[in-house]
Curated annotation (Swiss-Prot):
This is Uncharacterized protein YfmG. GO terms for molecular function: formylglycine-generating oxidase activity. Disulfide bonds: none annotated. It comes from the Bacteria. InterPro entries: CTDL_fold (IPR016187), Sulfatase_Mod_Factor_Kinase (IPR051043), SUMF_dom (IPR005532), SUMF_sf (IPR042095).
């Protein structure tokens, strides 16, 4: 049985056994026997840790890398963390380690930031030497080796040394939160790994082939300009590896089984940054209008993330979601280029009345929310129309679906990590598809909705994807993943 076919919980259990063995070994040789201790770490401990395959087990090692009191252990564990970059928690760990008090550790973490061009580290590194545009020609304090290492790392991330080019790129970065996009080229993943992945059988999921597709629309193609549509333009060429996506959205029944698992076993598969004592039971659990085989609603980003990891899956990026909805040809809607109310469940479906104005739409929403005579707001997943070109069902209307993409950058969403105010675009994850309360202007697949990670509106649901494991891609290409659309 290949790794890609193994049940993720059995992988997790095997990895925990490795961690227990490491914990016992790591104290078996005293630190004052320097050569023996280094040999233990370099050979036995690292060999064991490099067998770890589950992201949750890997995050235990990430925690060791940040918090273990021995400097040499933190230094060596960076090699383990690096092989998981750009997985979100590996990126966060490396950035935290750039602030480590020991140069042995912090300098090595900076090397990883430079090699992988970890753009999220720019703000943290800049806090040490201030603005790189000024520091390159007029250094401020501190002025020692550490400051020069930070400056060198930032220059490697920006990829330039000339002052004029640096100013231009830093200005772009300050405005957009990222460097110019690296989405439109093929990552050279070996065909053998792709074929192994594509041959796996994923029950209830549809394989979306890898390759190029067009993300977004041109302005003249926007089907409805009632709402803010400008971040949905223009069309952009994007390359993705293959992935599996759920044919149907996750149901209330399946989600409730997950919450029972959490209540019995604890928050094993939850987001490492989720609030303490997080309650995962959906807020629609208490409303009888939301039936078992209907799409789950009333969940936030942390709920969606935890459910996906509990299933051995992930949240889709907005690129993945949009490709699955629009197909390779980039239809405006999953079924073509014209809105078809018969294929969706939206605000007009509530009372079988077309939406003629913003006023009528708003009135319908408030009426339906208070209308206890409405038997249900959502519908059975098997009764949903509007298949995508790949055969994915119910992507438009019904429920908004969480992605793991950040609104401003389209990169991985890091909730809480950046400690930004909640009116900042950095604090929003992207949602897609519209809901039973939506106006048509909110529902075309390129439309980018947003919300903060702990918002639990009764319109928010989830659909999962399964990807080639990030560390498998890293191993196969023997270097950094440079296409930023992948993670």
């Amino acid at each position: 049985m290949t790794l890609l076919m193994q049940d993720h919980k059995s992988i997790y259990n095997k990895d925990i056994e490795i961690l227990i063995e490491v914990e016992e070994l790591i104290t078996s040789v005293p630190e004052n026997k320097k050569n023996d201790f280094k040999s233990l770490i370099d050979n036995r401990i690292m060999t064991l840790l490099n067998k770890i395959q589950h992201p949750v087990a890997a995050e235990n090692v990430f925690g060791m890398c940040i918090a273990y009191p021995n400097t040499y252990i933190r230094y060596r564990l960076i090699d383990f963390v690096e092989k998981w970059v750009p997985y979100f928690s590996a990126v966060e760990t490396i950035i935290n380690l750039t602030q480590d008090p020991d140069d042995l550790v912090s300098f090595k973490a900076m090397d990883v930031c430079a090699n992988h061009k970890i753009e999220e580290s720019v703000a943290y590194l800049s806090s040490i030497i201030d603005d790189v545009r000024e520091s390159i020609s007029y250094p401020k304090k501190p002025v020692g080796l550490g400051a020069q290492k930070v400056l060198s790392t930032l220059l490697d991330i920006f990829g330039v040394e000339k002052h004029e080019e640096l100013v231009m790129l830093k200005n772009y970065f300050d405005q957009n939160g990222i460097l110019p996009n690296n989405f439109d080229f093929e990552e050279k993943i070996p065909q053998s790994l792709i074929e192994e992945f594509e041959k796996t059988e994923e029950d209830g999921m549809i394989l979306i082939p890898g390759g190029f597709f067009e993300f977004g629309l041109n302005e003249n193609e926007i089907p409805d300009k009632t709402f803010n549509w400008k971040d949905a333009v223009p069309r952009q060429k994007v390359w993705l590896p293959p992935f599996f996506i759920d044919k149907y959205p996750v149901t209330n029944k399946d989600y409730d089984i997950f919450t029972e698992f959490i209540e019995e076993n604890g928050h094993i598969f939850c987001h490492p940054n989720e609030p303490q004592n997080k309650q995962h039971r959906r807020n629609t659990y208490w409303d009888d209008r939301y039936l078992d085989n209907h799409p789950v609603t009333g969940i936030d980003f942390y709920d969606a993330f935890a459910y996906a990891r509990y299933k051995g899956k992930e949240l889709p990026t907005e690129f993945q979601w949009e490709k699955a909805a629009r197909g390779e040809k980039g239809n405006v809607w999953p079924w073509g280029d014209k809105f078809d109310p018969a294929k969706v469940q939206y605000a007009g479906s509530l009372y079988n009345e077309p939406i003629t104005s913003l006023k009528s739409w708003r009135e319908n929403l408030l009426k339906a929310h208070a209308d206890k005579e409405l038997n249900h707001l959502t519908s059975d997943i098997f009764e949903q129309n509007g298949e995508s070109p790949y055969g994915v069902c119910g992507m438009i209307g019904g429920t908004w679906e969480w992605t793991r993409s950040e609104l401003k950058t389209k990169r991985a969403f890091h909730p809480i990590f950046e400690n930004v105010p909640f009116n900042s675009v950095n604090s929003f994850a992207v949602l897609k598809g519209g809901s039973f309360f939506s106006h048509p202007g909110l529902m075309f697949p390129s439309f980018r909705a947003k919300d903060i990670p702990f918002c639990r509106h009764n319109e928010m649901g989830i659909r999962c994807v399964k990807n080639i494991p990030v560390y498998k891609i890293r191993e196969s290409i023997n270097g950094p993943i440079t296409n930023k659309a992948i993670y």
